[in-house]
Amino acid sequence: MPKVALLNQTGTQVGDIELADAVFGIEPNEAVVYDAIVMQQASRRQGTHDTKGRSEVRGGGRKPWKQKGTGRARQGSIRSPQWVGGGTVFGPTPRSYAYKLPKKVRRLALRSALSSKVANNEFIVLEGLTIDAPKTKDMISVFAALSIERKVLVVTADYNETVVLSTRNIPGVTVVDAAGVNVLDLVAHDKVIFTKDAVARVEEVLA
């Protein structure tokens, strides 16, 4: 079982915490992690692109010149695709790019990302995270005590509005609850901070 230090908000070690092997101690599967990231990014695409076909472009109802006798190539509409200003052939239309990998694959990707963070010493567990009032400087003090200077993902057991409001003005900081942990956020941040209760929630679902 992987064991990591259990810290308080001042950065002092108050004990150790053993993490579930099945969640935090597996051999990371990079291919599955990649597939999960592509799935998430595809789901975030707007898909609002649109082009007009020959039936949608304004004009072109009249035949530009008679069929025979001009010596020119026959044409039926100035909005045919070969004309400048004509319709687009097989152009993009609004669509959803979202798709879902099988649940087992998604969970394997999440376990792989978590295990990778633990193996690379990028995983921090706090005994608790309590902020009395929404104050950015209080969260900055916590990060300073934990020697965190770069992008960090904070995971709480439940939605914590005070923590969310205290971090929203700090660049590179993302806060999610245990149910919202995802592969893209884990990979995109240099450090991950879990509260002790959040670890228990994640293990309950993924173990």
Swiss-Prot record:
SUPFAM superfamilies: Ribosomal protein L4. Belongs to the universal ribosomal protein uL4 family. Pfam families: Ribosomal_L4 (PF00573). GO terms for cellular component: ribonucleoprotein complex; ribosome. Part of the 50S ribosomal subunit. Residues 47-59 have a biased composition (Basic and acidic residues). One of the primary rRNA binding proteins, this protein initially binds near the 5'-end of the 23S rRNA. It is important during the early stages of 50S assembly. It makes multiple contacts with different domains of the 23S rRNA in the assembled 50S subunit and ribosome. This is Large ribosomal subunit protein uL4.
